[in-house]
């Protein structure tokens, strides 16, 4: 027997594309500063990443041609294999998720056993994000849930774009779970 009435819920898989390569430096800098990283360290890393020159190295040798950024045409991103990329992405995505929650993108659930309310927004692992959607009323229609999912995904996509990121459409999907009383 069900203790609480079942509610329609949804989970959106909204995975990012090229997460380390698309990190914009200004929001990443602000996110790292919020974690206590000194601005001088951030400035050094960002300057190096923006102006670094790269070449291809294989078992056949090193490419004579280089590519990269300059002061006039800087690169973005944190660099694949960089020790700075994972903590930078962690800081950036935690700030983005905080903005998402403050804007109302979250599921509010009350435990029937503890009578405590939990605000859950997502489950994240690196660039793989599952957004949780929960309509406030147990009598909400499937259309209301679908509208909430669309609004939440659009909100998350807008926040991600502000950090330099993109949603990778091929890796995005939605699972709707609805109940019907008989």
Question: Which residues does each predicted region cover?
Answer:
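Conserved catalytic palm subdomain of right-hand nucleotidyl-transferase polymerases, strongest
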Residues: 1-35
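Catalytic palm active-site di-aspartate
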Residues: 9-19, 76-86, 109-141, 160, ...
């Amino acid at each position: 027997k069900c203790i609480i009435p079942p509610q329609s819920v949804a989970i959106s898989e909204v995975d990012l594309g090229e997460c380390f390569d698309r990190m914009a430096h200004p929001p990443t800098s602000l996110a790292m500063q919020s974690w206590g990283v000194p601005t001088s360290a951030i400035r050094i890393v960002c300057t190096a990443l923006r102006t670094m020159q790269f070449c291809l190295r294989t078992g056949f040798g090193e490419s004579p041609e280089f590519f990269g950024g300059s002061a006039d045409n800087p690169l973005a991103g944190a660099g694949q294999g960089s020790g700075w990329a994972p903590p930078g992405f962690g800081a950036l995505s935690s700030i983005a998720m905080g903005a998402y929650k403050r804007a109302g993108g979250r599921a509010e659930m009350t435990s029937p056993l503890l009578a405590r309310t939990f605000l859950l927004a997502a489950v994240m692992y690196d660039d793989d994000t599952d957004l949780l959607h929960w309509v406030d009323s147990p009598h909400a229609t499937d259309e209301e849930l679908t509208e909430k999912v669309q609004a939440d995904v659009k909100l998350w996509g807008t926040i991600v774009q502000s950090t330099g990121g993109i949603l990778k459409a091929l890796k995005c999907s939605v699972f709707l779970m609805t109940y019907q009383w008989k």
